[in-house]
Amino acid sequence: MRIVKRGGYAYLFMGSGPGRAFEPTGAAIPVPFSGDFYIGIGLSAHDKDVVEKAIFSNVTLDPLPAGATPVTEKNSALYSTLETVAIDSTIRTIKYVQKARFEAPNWTRDGASFLFNRDGRIWRFPAAVPDPVTAGAQPPPSPEPVAIDTSFATRCNNDHGISPDGTDLVISDNSQDTHDSLVYVLPITGIASGGAPRRITKNSPSYWHGWSPDGKTLAFVGERNGDFDIYTLPASATSSADETRLTTAKGLDDGPEYTPDGKWIYFNSERTGHMQIWRMHPDGSAQEQVTHDEWNNWFPHFSPDGKWMVMLSYDKSVTGHPENKDVQLRLMSMADGKITVLARLFGGQSTINVPSWSPDSKKLAFVSYELLPAETPAK
């Protein structure tokens, strides 16, 4: 095992034997080290009634050499980690780690799989896999993701989702026309087979974000004449249908999502000069600000039971929703509006662009990222 601290993050690596390379386990955790501190290895039984004895052998402490080159995206390898976090305990569980960029998980309606995009395709990955950190010395090999057949749509971006009844997949894809994003719907059977996409939006670029609880309406973001606003179309529409514009304020409006009862569409807007969460009725009326804080808040997502809203929060100094930033997933209680921190991570763009709650409302799926040295040999 190797623990490496770089900047404000601590990384855990696991090796499978002498001479074998250490592989990152994913889920880097920000650790606020400052000044003098002690380092070491500890063991916990996670049970107050259990006393454990452990022997650590072959332990070395190696500081980075003076003048070592800082790790940046240009001189490092990017690792993506699919994680889940429990709402009640904030315990994070690693599901899948890959030396590549994948993005924006959805959790299927039956709870059996995750969907995410990678290299222009949509992939399916089983939800019931052991955490490689807690699975023991010889964890079982991780299964590989399986691509869903999306026919000609091979430039899918990170705005995709699943219909309320679990039978259809909506994608945003850049394969046709001028290669600007368009919204499509395709049938799926158990999130396995796929099919020919049906084009929904006539105009581009358009990016899907929300599906009404009754399955009849899609909400999406479109750039029209230089302004990004929120629009809707029937889920049964074809590319000849006219879209309905819901927002007209100057500045970016993004991330529309319906509440589970269908009474509101929540979204993020910078119309006040500061990105905050807003809401409106499904016809665009009664637009009002929801969050009023010093964070830049993006992408509101609701638990299926309607009790919680999660959002992606950047420091107020960050413009837009870039990748490779220190961010927080923050949880708002819909009962009293109280906001708590659910997870701190390195990510941003692609972490939770789309709905990713578990069907039982107990967990949230997201993607975190790590920038690590391209080679990490074992000693």
Residue ranges and their predicted role:
Residues 1-70:
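Extracellular glycan-recognition regions
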Residues 68-379:
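Sequence signature of WD/YWTD-type beta-propeller architectures
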